[in-house]
Amino acid sequence: PYSMFQTLTKGNGLMGPQTWMTPQERYDVIHYLREKFMKPMHPKYQSLTDEYLAGLPKVNTVVPITKQVGRDFGPALASQLGRDVSSVLTVKLGDAHSISYNLHTMDQAAVWRGGFLKLRGTQHYRERGESVPEVEGDPISGLQSWRWAHDGGFDYPTEDLLPRGPMPSKWMEYRGHHLHGAKVVLSYSINGRDVLEMPSKPAGFRAIVHTLHIAPGKQSLQLSVAQLEGEGARRGFLDPKATTVKLLQAKKSVAERLAVIGFPAKGPLERFAAAATFGETDGLDWSFDGKGRAILTIPASKKARLFQVIRYSAKTDAQLLSMAGYLGHLKLKNALPHPAKLLLGGKVRWPKVITTKGTLGKADAAYVMDTLTLPAKKPGKVWFRTSALAFFPDGRLAVCTHGGDVWIVSDVDESLANLKWKRFAAGMYEPFGLQVIDGLVYVTCKDRLTRLHDFNEDGEADFYESFSADDDVSTFFHAFNFDLQRDAAGNLYYAKSGQYTSYALAGSVIKVSPDGKKREIHCTGFRTPNGMGILPDGRVTVSDNQGSWMPASKVSLCKPGGFYGYVQTHVHKQRLWAPDGGRIDHRKVVPPETFDQPLIWMPQDFDNSSGGQLWVDDKRWGPLSGRLLHTSFGKGWLYYMMLQEIDGHDQAAIVRLKIDALTGIHRARVNPQDGQVYATGLNGWNGGGRKGLSQGHVHRFRYTGKHANLLTDTKILADGIELKFNFKLDPKSATDASRYKLKQWNYKWTQGYGSKQYSLRNPGKIGQDEVDIQGIEIVGDGHAVFLKIPDIQPVHQVKIELNLHAVDGSPFKELVYLTINKVPGP
């Protein structure tokens, strides 16, 4: 067991360390293996009895009790809630009260007292956070219904609604939330009428208060504010001046009265839910329905209306009368906060600007790596798991974290000596992509594209705008939205996970119009597309990772309507994820006969978990400018690619820069001020990756101006391969066939996890083929060679190892991988 524990903790061979597991979970794995596999085969298996346990050595070390670090997400956190509601905003109300809104309906998902959210097993605390946010505390009985009516009722048909997406805009449109200090103002429309809503919990009284500003509209609105079901309930209205509990029955209610649902039908109350209104209440009407709902009707109006709904749930007559007393207090105070006055920002929440000093790499090569040091002491105990980055035109850097932050870094100069980090936003839903457009930060979240506004220009976001809501949001932890790319026309692109999701169409690339109003599926068939890129002509690239229906890691150059390999034929045994939430029978999914081939395949030891791509077009980045770069989340490496198009078929070769990042990198951008490449990423679920990667770093890959001998191009020709270099070759070594080692192989596309390497010459046989070179020619002025391979043909993978010399005698060793999709005709 001890050696197994060491393997799980530190890794061994091809198995990476399972750092995401707690010690208890590692012991659970060991116990499972012991009982399930070893027990039947081990004749001397020792049963776990009290006597056996008593005979074990005594532990004389005190195990420290670890306390959960308190994260500060600001006043609200976007997430899912449990495994049923995939997009919520949970608001801290104060006094350990919290409310969660379903952003697909703007109905309440839950309201409770006793804490915020249970997050210990999620990505906010664990590398591989497979748990989901749950209510931390006790749901408030009777107040779980805060629900808008549509089509004349609350039990409207849902068959034609998106199962994991927002309602039709004619019913509800969520616009975002504003922050003003600790206050949160929600902006949305219901049945065509604009609503501003600010939830709160009054000091000294355990009620939930909703301040509502309802815009004019021709349609009346209905809102269920409380609900208690059961036989023998009493329903009626309480005069706020009453000194005893006597519920009045009226054909038409008076808005100033309290609407009450209580038990039992007679005698002192044992439990109740009550609601009241305050403010501009003329024309508001209370009613009850057969399902125990207290319903507020807001009439059509030519004027806007500002009022509060106060909701309270307790057990006794005295507590109900205390609510009447609270209403009297409100009337004496005669003050009603106006949400519209809280939309442009309040006081700074995180005033501290943190200064760090970066580390410069030794400028002894053409390309070196610098490190932008992350803040050590951070406000809110932020876990700096960096997930994406983007630049402002002036060179300021936006960096987001997996936990939901955006930070702005200024003074990103050549020396990196005085980096200033300022927290700009927090509480977003698993950001994995960033863009800066016209000075505004756009964030790819799990449930939408969010656009951040700083109205009062204090360096913090005041409005988290829902720029484009995703129409299919899965509740499984692995269902990420990746990256954010922008074409010349202003369209935005991001990629959705394929496997381990409940999506109706898994593994899609989503194209969003410049105004955020139009969404379309650009292409499909990706398993875990953790990264994208975009070429100068507007075509997008997408990476993928080895797994089911994915033979190896790859990068694809995508076309509209393309299909790139992943087929949704898998389902979780407990149905935590299933095609279209289980609406599609995965057993009846018929895989296509083929798929669109990638630019490049890559074996696991070269890139086990691919990141995004970056087209570098700044000449200040030296000889590798003007080409496509690739990143590796699993290895923490940066690569450059050489593209070739033959008769409409695209293919590539790829070479790794010999620099080891300190973390897995999957997002890269060019700084417009210095022309250098910056990259970021994190670590987590990374079996087979490079060991020792950190949970987050930001690096600069800098061109120093020094010369580097480089392989600059590869071309597949009718009878061989041409290799070009940026230096003149030594003819003797360049024409020596022993200086080149070429191997080739294919992968098999199946529903199994990954693929072995298969012979091209003997299909079905596991193994690589040696590639014979029939001749070598120096091409042109000595900067290129042609390797004559008469039987060259399409193949998934070619591996070329070079061991050459330049004409000045300097050695040149390189490893390059190619994919051949097309060989030109003679």
What is each PLM-predicted segment?
Residues 179-209, 704-731, 738:
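Surface beta-strand/loop "capping" patches
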Residues 42-209, 220-253:
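Beta-strand-rich N-terminal accessory domains
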Residues 337-339, 705-711, 730, 793, ...:
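Acidic, Ser/Thr/Gly/Pro-rich low-complexity segments and short DxT(G/T)-type signature motifs
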Residues 41-86, 313-370, 375, 824-826:
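N-terminal pre-domain segments of enzymes
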Residues 220-222, 226-307, 749, 762-763, ...:
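Trp/Gly-enriched beta-strand surface patches
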Residues 1-40, 477:
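Extracytoplasmic electron-transfer domains, predominantly the class I c-type cytochrome c fold
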Residues 320-708, 712, 731:
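Beta-propeller domains with acidic blade repeats across secreted/periplasmic ectodomains
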Residues 723, 728-775, 800-806, 814-819:
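Short, surface-exposed alpha-helix to beta-strand junction/turn motifs within ectodomains of secreted
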